[in-house]
UniProtKB/Swiss-Prot annotation:
GO terms for molecular function: histidinol-phosphate transaminase activity; pyridoxal phosphate binding. The modification N6-(pyridoxal phosphate)lysine is found at K206. GO terms for biological process: L-histidine biosynthetic process. The gene is hisC. Gene3D superfamilies: Aspartate Aminotransferase, domain 1, Type I PLP-dependent aspartate aminotransferase-like (Major domain). Pathway: Amino-acid biosynthesis; L-histidine biosynthesis; L-histidine from 5-phospho-alpha-D-ribose 1-diphosphate: step 7/9. Homodimer. Belongs to the class-II pyridoxal-phosphate-dependent aminotransferase family. Histidinol-phosphate aminotransferase subfamily. Its EC number is 2.6.1.9. It comes from Phocaeicola vulgatus (strain ATCC 8482 / DSM 1447 / JCM 5826 / CCUG 4940 / NBRC 14291 / NCTC 11154) (Bacteroides vulgatus). Keywords: Amino-acid biosynthesis, Aminotransferase, Histidine biosynthesis, Pyridoxal phosphate, Transferase. SUPFAM superfamilies: PLP-dependent transferases. This is Histidinol-phosphate aminotransferase. It catalyses: L-histidinol phosphate + 2-oxoglutarate = 3-(imidazol-4-yl)-2-oxopropyl phosphate + L-glutamate. The keyword Transferase applies.
């Protein structure tokens, strides 16, 4: 890996971050707050939240088996995606490399930040080659994006190829593990010390059932996290989100129950879906969704919309012609989908 200073945009490295009132307050006991020009009358949301989300990070750390200083919390994982561009990529100069197809926000954030986005197609099994990704890089490649389990394909990427990339690439490797709670594959969180160029994304939106509160997690070395903290907005995670996340962390046993139930439903739904006349193939999945190749994705999608059932038509993206992405719902929801498709005339 190149020196972190060399990878970071010079203006970001030299940046003196904005210091909010609560940044300067070290968390000692206090009962009178006259530092932030807040309304003193309790609503009870009159006070700014902890800008560093200390309570939340201290609860996440033992669950994820990491140091709190290696955690960044953002307004959804999309904030962390945007931050890696703003921190490390010089607009109009640097580039990033990503597998294709994958999560669309990697490219959206590249376009917003005027960074060249280079795609490397997966093979017919939706796997990637580290050598092919490396061949797409040059001296101005700052980031490589991987998503495992991948969205929209659903499968885990080959760990050996991921490790080879981490060992070889001189920039930063982002591994998005948004769906890892549904997979038996070990997380890369345990390898943060081994790979200083590794950034891992996770989220509260999937297994934790908290998509509405918009809370994403990034894990990396303390040095990388400190750069994120320099350039994030002062109060990027609001108090209501922090409170809801703390409450969910106290109920983490429910997440395990939800995941078990969803995996059982995934098996049932896939086994029945593959028998439908309109289904040509279901690709292997390690997530809470599956990708199905069907006879006519657009026609079936519109048919389901007419029945009040929404799936995702992925036919317009690479390697997904006539494919629908189907999220695993509750048993009654899944039964409604199956019943509708059994009545569909191919």
């Amino acid at each position: 890996m190149k020196d972190l200073k060399e990878l970071t945009r010079p203006n970001i490295w030299a940046l003196k971050p904005y210091s909010s009132a609560r940044d300067e307050y070290n968390g000692a006991e206090a009962s009178v707050f006259l530092d932030a020009n807040e309304n003193p009358y309790n609503t009870p949301n009159n006070r700014y939240p902890d800008p560093m989300q200390r309570e939340l990070k201290n609860m996440i750390a033992p669950i994820k088996k990491v140091d709190p200083d290696t955690i960044f919390l953002g307004n959804g994982s999309d904030e962390a995606i945007d931050l890696v561009y703003r921190a490390f990529c010089i607009p109009g100069v640097d580039n990033v490399v990503a597998i294709d197809p994958t999560y669309g926000m990697y490219q959206v954030c590249a376009d917003v930040n005027d960074v060249e986005y280079r795609k490397v197609l997966l093979d017919e099994n939706y796997q990637f080659s580290a050598d092919k990704l490396l061949a797409a890089t040059d001296d101005h490649t700052k980031l490589v994006f991987l998503c495992s389990p991948n969205n929209p394909t659903g499968n885990n990427l080959d760990r050996r190829e991921m490790e080879k990339l981490l060992d070889t690439f001189q920039g930063l490797v982002i591994i998005d593990e948004a769906y890892s709670d549904f997979s038996d594959a070990p997380s890369f969180l345990a390898d943060l010390d081994k790979y200083p160029n590794l950034i891992v994304f996770q989220t509260f939106s999937k297994a934790w059932g908290c998509a509405a509160i918009r809370l994403g997690m990034a894990f990396a070395s303390k040095e990388i996290i400190s750069i994120f903290s320099k350039i994030k907005y002062p109060y990027n995670v609001n108090l209501l989100t922090q409170k809801e996340a703390v409450m969910m962390l106290h109920r983490h046993y429910e997440v395990e129950r939800w995941v078990k139930s969803l995996l059982e439903e995934r098996t049932r739904l896939v086994n029945e879906f593959v028998e439908l006349p309109c289904c040509e193939k279901i690709y292997p999945t390690d997530a809470n969704f599956f990708l199905a190749k069907v006879t006519d994705a657009k026609k079936i999608y519109n048919y389901l919309v007419g029945k009040g059932i929404i799936v995702r038509n992925r036919t317009s993206i690479s390697l997904c012609r006539d494919c629908l992405r189907v999220t695993i719902g509750t048993r009654p929801e899944n039964d409604m989908l199956l019943e509708a498709l059994k009545n569909y005339e191919c």
